[in-house]
């Protein structure tokens, strides 16, 4: 699972 804070918080 990868989480990114930009451009908005999302995990996929």
Swiss-Prot record:
Cystine bridges: 3-11
UniProt entry tagged with the keyword Disulfide bond: yes
UniProt keyword list: Amphibian defense peptide, Disulfide bond, Secreted
Disulfide bond listed as a keyword: yes
Subcellular compartments: Secreted
Listed GO CC annotations: extracellular region
Tissue spec. comment: Expressed by the skin glands.
GO biological process: defense response
Function: Stimulates insulin release from beta cells at a concentration of 1 nM and release of glucagon-like peptide 1 (GLP-1) from enteroendocrine cells in vitro. Reduces secretion of interferon gamma from peritoneal cells in a mouse model. Has no inhibitory activity against Gram-positive bacterium B.megaterium Bm11 or Gram-negative bacterium E.coli ATCC 25922 at concentrations of up to 100 uM. Has no hemolytic activity against mouse erythrocytes.
Protein name: Tigerinin-1O
Lineage per the UniProt record: Eukaryota, Metazoa, Chordata, Craniata, Vertebrata
